[in-house]
């Protein structure tokens, strides 16, 4: 069970975007893509077959999962734990003890 999932609101706790918040767009094995965070400029060649024009595009790149933390109700970074409730594993915030949605 992943501790961080798509749709979670997270805060960056390390790196060039430290302190910024965003919503998780995708989760890979050990990396997360966060909306509007870790933007890089990529040069794109024009391709008439795809109908794209050339130029420089800003693209969101993945961050390592250890560099982000879930935001709790108070707006602070929180670690996520896993516990068993009624025979099912659920994620909970270590700071407040609140259970995260499935």
UniProtKB/Swiss-Prot annotation:
Gene Ontology biological process terms, A to Z: translation
Entry's Gene Ontology molecular function annotations: rRNA binding; structural constituent of ribosome
GO CC field: ribonucleoprotein complex; ribosome
Keywords: Ribonucleoprotein, Ribosomal protein, RNA-binding, rRNA-binding
Gene3D superfamilies xrefs: 2.30.30.30
PROSITE patterns associated with the record: RIBOSOMAL_L24 (PS01108)
One Pfam family of this chain: KOW
Function text: One of two assembly initiator proteins, it binds directly to the 5'-end of the 23S rRNA, where it nucleates assembly of the 50S subunit. One of the proteins that surrounds the polypeptide exit tunnel on the outside of the subunit.
UniProt subunit comment: Part of the 50S ribosomal subunit.
Membership in a protein family: Belongs to the universal ribosomal protein uL24 family.
HAMAP family documented for this protein: Ribosomal_uL24_B
Listed PANTHER family: MITOCHONDRIAL RIBOSOMAL PROTEIN L24 (PTHR12903)
Protein name stated in the entry: Large ribosomal subunit protein uL24
Source species of the chain: Burkholderia multivorans (strain ATCC 17616 / 249)
